[in-house]
Amino acid sequence: MYQDEIKHEIKTLLGERNGILLAHNYMRDEVQEIADITGDSLGLSIEAAKTDASVIVFCGVHFMAESASILAPDKTVLLPRLDAGCPMADMVTVPELQELKARHPGVPVVTYVNSSAAIKAISDICCTSANAVKVVKSLPESEIIFVPDRNLGRYVARFTDKTFHYWDGYCPTHERLKPDAVIRLKQEFPDALFICHPECNPEVEALADHVCSTTGMYDYCRKNPARRFIIGTEAGILYRLKKENPDKEFILASPALVCPNMKLTSLEDILESLRTMTPVVKVPEEIRIPAKQALDRMLAIPRD
């Protein structure tokens, strides 16, 4: 079946099922192209909760579909590739986090949304890469436990005077971006601005003109008068950056910035998922309710 035929059948089935297709910013180009909404993990989950659709086809990785299930329990959440996981989310387990909490009694746990539902359920509050600084500053305590991303935690710590207990997790894709690669590109393209994600390591962030979330990157590149940007995050972001800014040039900071899990989902997978209405991701209520409380506490913090 040709791609155009697959896309047509996907759209037909979405209509028949009262479905909506959500795609993360790191998905393959052709998946982002047919999505009803593209965005970051939390933004998509909020859209899932707001939509009138009864079926959510979530093109992303497992923890994202879980978040959609947490915020939209009355909807059917499909994850076309159940094997699309997140190594960073898997780096922290419930027993390990409970042990860390026991070593630091009374210290609140701030959990990055790139985490499993089970971890969110034993956390005090969640954060995104965009609002992490604001979330941490909102807490009255002088100490926090930050999981699972050490790089995001270190980035946030620069803007607060709190004591951090980091989990030693990281994103393997962002970790592959090394300072040498950035320095070479900055020398080759001296007029280019380098922007990177806070999941990058601190040595890379130190070279950046701007550090921000994926949503922040779209805004920054659209508003900034510069014509050339070096991009320090997963390659999938280039699709929308180029589409929204056809007169600007975007250079991926390293060919290693490709997440294999984000690239698993194909158009064929989406079609098969809609045909069979599987695989369904459903978070059990005993996990969903406390996990939703951690997300709700974050969502209650006023946005800028």
UniProtKB/Swiss-Prot annotation:
Free-text comment on the cofactor: Binds 1 [4Fe-4S] cluster per subunit.
Protein name: Quinolinate synthase
Principal location listed in the UniProt entry: cytoplasm
Origin: domain of life: Bacteria
Residues annotated to bind iminosuccinate: H24, S41, Y112, V113, N114, S129, H197, P198, E199, T214
One example of a Gene Ontology biological process annotation: 'de novo' NAD biosynthetic process from L-aspartate
Residues at which [4Fe-4S] cluster binds: C86, C171, C259
Enzyme class, first EC level, given as a word: transferase
Localization: Cytoplasm
The keyword tRNA-binding is assigned to this record: no
Pathway: Cofactor biosynthesis; NAD(+) biosynthesis; quinolinate from iminoaspartate: step 1/1
Family as reported in the entry's similarity comment: Belongs to the quinolinate synthase family. Type 2 subfamily.
Cofactor(s) required, per the database record: [4Fe-4S] cluster
Keyword set, alphabetical order: 4Fe-4S, Cytoplasm, Iron, Iron-sulfur, Metal-binding, Pyridine nucleotide biosynthesis, Transferase
UniProt cross-references to HAMAP family, sorted A to Z: NadA_type2 (MF_00568)
Gene Ontology cellular-component terms listed: cytosol
Taxonomic source organism: Geotalea uraniireducens (strain Rf4)
Record function comment: Catalyzes the condensation of iminoaspartate with dihydroxyacetone phosphate to form quinolinate.
Catalytic reaction list: iminosuccinate + dihydroxyacetone phosphate = quinolinate + phosphate + 2 H2O + H(+)
Native organism taxonomy: Bacteria, Pseudomonadati, Thermodesulfobacteriota, Desulfuromonadia, Geobacterales
GO molecular function term, any single one: 4 iron, 4 sulfur cluster binding
EC number of the protein: 2.5.1.72
